[in-house]
């Protein structure tokens, strides 16, 4: 009986030992599976976090880009506005310069007209005196000049005075118009009479009754003339 009891005890110990030895073998795969599950969980979680981070970065970049684009848009609008203002200012400036130049031209012409009118009036007043000197010189006879020194000196004095007058007139652009022998020009001459002259060309001036004058090449007094009559 004692021997049987010992055998039974040994048999139980053997079973327990086998169970104990077998248990770790079953536990190891279970631990591996749990570890792998945890690793997979953490890996997926890391990927999700990484994707979330990438999306956040992309969103931030988009926001930054949108802000830069808005800033550029604002700057472009400001530039366009300033460009338009500059163009308007330039246009106004050019118009002002053009108006000023036109005013200068008008003022210059008005001054020239006023000067010309005053000079023309002055010249006309003097022309009568010059004519009188001419008439006086024409009244002297050649034989009287040769006979009398006093008459000759008087003639010389009158002529010198007339020459001074004519020189003064010429200084201001007033020229004598003596058309003797020229073709009659109604713009420069005033025909007081016509007469047939066999030895002269018809339509030409054969006698100057009164000299004409021009001011800066513009007639201020036409010459009074006698014209050869047409056949």
Swiss-Prot record:
InterPro entries: GrpE, GrpE_coiled_coil, GrpE_head
Keyword Mitochondrion recorded: yes
A GO term from the CC aspect: PAM complex, Tim23 associated import motor
Listed CDD domains: GrpE (cd00446)
Classification via SUPFAM superfamilies: Coiled-coil domain of nucleotide exchange factor GrpE, Head domain of nucleotide exchange factor GrpE
One GO BP: protein import into mitochondrial matrix
Pfam families: GrpE (PF01025)
PROSITE patterns reported for this sequence: GRPE
GO molecular function: adenyl-nucleotide exchange factor activity; protein homodimerization activity; protein-folding chaperone binding; unfolded protein binding
HAMAP family: GrpE
Protein family: Belongs to the GrpE family.
Subunit field text: Component of the PAM complex, at least composed of mtHsp70, MGE1, TIM44, PAM16, PAM17 and PAM18.
Role this protein plays: Essential component of the PAM complex, a complex required for the translocation of transit peptide-containing proteins from the inner membrane into the mitochondrial matrix in an ATP-dependent manner. Seems to control the nucleotide-dependent binding of SSC1 to substrate proteins.
Name of the featured protein: GrpE protein homolog, mitochondrial
Species: Candida glabrata (strain ATCC 2001 / BCRC 20586 / JCM 3761 / NBRC 0622 / NRRL Y-65 / CBS 138)
